[in-house]
Structure formats: structure tokens, C-alpha cells
Amino acid sequence: MQDNQKVKKKEQYNLNKLQKRLRRNVGEAIADFNMIEEGDRIMVCLSGGKDSYTMLEILRNLQQSAPINFSLVAVNLDQKQPGFPEHILPAYLEQLGVEYKIVEENTYGIVKEKIPEGKTTCSLCSRLRRGILYRTATELGATKIALGHHRDDILQTLFLNMFYGGKMKGMPPKLMSDDGKHIVIRPLAYCREKDIVRFAEAKAFPIIPCNLCGSQPNLQRQVIADMLRDWDKRYPGRIETMFSAMQDIVPSHLCDTNLFDFKGIAHGSEVVDGGDLAFDREEIPLQPAGWQPEEDDTPLETLRLDVIEVK
């Protein structure tokens, strides 16, 4: 009996520690990019996957202690995919007492009509979904639209654009829609996918499969995802360093003439940021920038097991 209590206490401690880390990550992202302001009405896009469930849970948690007032409304788009369990999200949200709206639009039928069998449908589906969500945000009076993309998604997009698109372009934590009417935020921008996976499992969210449409997976993105996972295992700290690099750009040491006036460099010009690397090799730190050993690596005997609530 005592052993079972110790196990449960340890599991609760680990869950609280994980939730604190996710809260901290989300809080830092919100502060760094001014994602949420006083009086905001946040439309939380809920797909039924681990990421959007986690986003809603952490935002609800932060809402209770935030120094500003903001409201949340969860929105799910029922695209009429065969086998979609329509009852799951309403039951879950009603249990939480969260305001929500289920938008029913047969985008599945449109996509199946327009895209040949066996081809990836994600691009058209995404465009249709985006338009519907923007319209819904207007109807609900939402000032911000929250999406559940995390740090790994942002890095994957960076490498996809580098490898296949020839661009240094990632996925912004905050953006304005093309029509200038909607601000989109990604509160999980600093969160690791593996933390989200563990959190979703511990919370036992009622996950809805993402392959109901029968679309072929994005093989290019899968290749990039596998590459990053391999690097994370073989080279601890590399993922953290790459993400830090996205936040510390030195235009004078790249090759984009739109970002830096290389032609304007002449005798008497100011010294550019980044240092003079014309002759000397730059010294690289032995430990990856922005990386610290994971908290989960703490030896079990040093863990306090008396913390059972997130303060």
C-alpha cells in the first residue's frame, strides 16, 4: 500500500514539474511577443490533438494567475470527415466549463472532389480551414486566434524551407493575417514536443486521430522530423541551440542584400555587428548555446516527493 502511494506521489510530482515547465515556456512566449493583452478574447483552435489540448489546458491555468484579464473560447472545425467522433470535444469542454463553438463545414467533401485520389490534401484543406476560422473569429469577436504549433513545428518548418524552398523562413510565433484583420498567436512556440506528449499522456486527454481524412502524410516533413529527433538523441543540446539561433540573427553575416547593405560598405563605414571574421575562425563554445541538462535527468534520490500541487 505504501509503495503504491509513493509511486502515485512521484507521478504527481513529475506531472506538476512538467506542467510548471510548460507554463513557464508559454508564459515566456506570451511576454516576449506580447501575445495576450488586457481584455483579449482568445479563440483557441482545438483539433482534438495533443498540442491543442495542452495549449487550452495551459492557457486556462495561466488565466487564473495572470496579471491581466482575458477570456478564452474554444473552437473546433468539424470538417465532416468519415468516422469523426463528434461527441468527444463537446463532452470534454462541457465538463471543463469552457465556452466553445463547434463549426460544421463539409470541407472534406470539397477536398475529395478537387484533389485526385492518393495525392496530399493538406494544402487545400489548410486554406479552407484558415478561411473558416478567420470568419468564425470575427463572428465571435475574438481579438486573437491561438494555434497549437510548438518549438519542433517551428524548427521543422525552418528546415523544410531551407531544404526544399530555398528560404530562411520558419513559423512566426505571432503574425497578422493577410487581410490585416486577425492576429494569430502560437503560445506553445517555446514548448518541446516531447514535453507535450508526456503531458497529454499524463492528463489522459481524449485524443482524436488526425488521419481520418485518409490523406497521405507529408513525407518531406516526416523526413525533417525524423532528422531532428535523431539529432536530439545523438547530440544533446543541438535542438536548443538551433532554436536559439532563430532568435539571434546577424544579417551582416548572411547573404541577403535586402537585409543588409553590403554594397554600401566602404572605407570609413561603421563596424558591423557580428565581428570581423575575414581571417580568423570563430571560436565555438564547447557546450551548445542555450542548452542545459534536462530536469528529468535529476537522480531520483534527489527528488522531493512532497510537492503535489502546482503553486
Swiss-Prot record:
Q: Give the Enzyme Commission number.
A: 2.8.1.-
Q: Name one GO biological process term.
A: tRNA thio-modification
The cross-references to SUPFAM superfamilies, in alphabetical order and at most eight, read: Adenine nucleotide alpha hydrolases-like
What does the Swiss-Prot or TrEMBL cofactor note state? Binds 1 [4Fe-4S] cluster per subunit. The cluster is chelated by three Cys residues, the fourth Fe has a free coordination site that may bind a sulfur atom transferred from the persulfide of IscS.
Q: Where does [4Fe-4S] cluster bind?
A: C122, C125, C213
Q: Highest taxon of the source? A: Bacteria
GO CC: one term?
Answer: cytoplasm
Q: What cofactor does this one take?
A: Mg(2+); [4Fe-4S] cluster
Kindly report, in one word, the top-level EC class recorded for this enzyme: transferase
Q: Which InterPro entries does this entry report, sorted A to Z?
A: Rossmann-like_a/b/a_fold, TilS/TtcA_N, tRNA_Cyd_32_2_STrfase, tRNA_thiolation_TtcA_Ctu1
Pathway given in the UniProt record: tRNA modification
Reaction(s) this enzyme catalyzes, per UniProt: cytidine(32) in tRNA + S-sulfanyl-L-cysteinyl-[cysteine desulfurase] + AH2 + ATP = 2-thiocytidine(32) in tRNA + L-cysteinyl-[cysteine desulfurase] + A + AMP + diphosphate + H(+)
The entry assigns this protein to a family as follows: Belongs to the TtcA family.
Q: What else is known?
A: The thiolation reaction likely consists of two steps: a first activation step by ATP to form an adenylated intermediate of the target base of tRNA, and a second nucleophilic substitution step of the sulfur (S) atom supplied by the hydrosulfide attached to the Fe-S cluster.
Q: Tell me what this protein is called.
A: tRNA-cytidine(32) 2-sulfurtransferase
